From Swiss-Prot:
The chain crosses the membrane at residues 54-74, 81-101. This is Uncharacterized protein MG149.1. It is a multi-pass membrane protein. GO terms for cellular component: plasma membrane. The keyword Membrane applies. Keywords: Cell membrane, Membrane, Transmembrane, Transmembrane helix. Disruption phenotype: Not essential, it can be deleted. The lineage of its organism: Bacteria, Bacillati, Mycoplasmatota, Mycoplasmoidales, Mycoplasmoidaceae. The keyword Transmembrane applies. It is found in: Cell membrane.
Length: 154
């Protein structure tokens, strides 16, 4: 059973009423698992788009600095263009420091949410970060089939 069909089944109101009558503890665990999956997806997508925007913005800044340097070298202009190039490089350095500190803030905020909200969330976040990002933010070596095994154990 995939996560999608499991979620659709779980949030069908008739099934929730039936499951509550049969085993209320099981329903609580299932709700916690679905909450963990949704929260992990949100955290990972925020990381992914933050890193992507960071790389794209850096490319734009470096291209602008490179164009300024080419204009300075090819044309006979004042030394003010060298100042523009140096200012662009300094701006890129400070932008990188600021944005990397922002990514660390998101990372620690996500870690705190993991510890406070759900026991399943750390495992799911490890699995999804391995699938979505070129490197694992949590240093995980787990594979996607662990999520299916965890659902089957429930």
């Amino acid at each position: 059973m995939t996560v999608y069909t499991y979620t659709v089944f779980l949030f069908n109101w008739e099934n929730i009423g039936l499951m509550e009558q049969q085993n209320p503890d099981r329903l609580k665990k299932d709700r916690e698992l679905i909450y963990a999956i949704v929260t992990a997806k949100g955290i990972i997508s925020r990381f992914f788009w933050s890193i992507l925007s960071f790389l794209i913005t850096n490319l734009i800044f470096f291209f602008a600095a490179f164009v300024a340097l080419l204009i300075y070298l090819l044309a006979s202009v004042d030394n003010q263009f060298a100042f523009v190039f140096i200012a662009a490089i300094i701006f890129i350095i400070f932008y990188n420091i600021f944005f990397l500190s922002y990514l660390l803030f998101i990372y620690f905020k996500g870690q705190k949410a993991i510890e406070n909200n759900c026991k399943y969330l750390l495992t799911i976040l490890d699995i999804k970060s391995d699938e979505l990002l070129p490197f694992s933010l949590l240093g995980s070596l787990r594979k996607g089939y662990m999520l299916d095994e965890m659902l089957l154990e429930q």
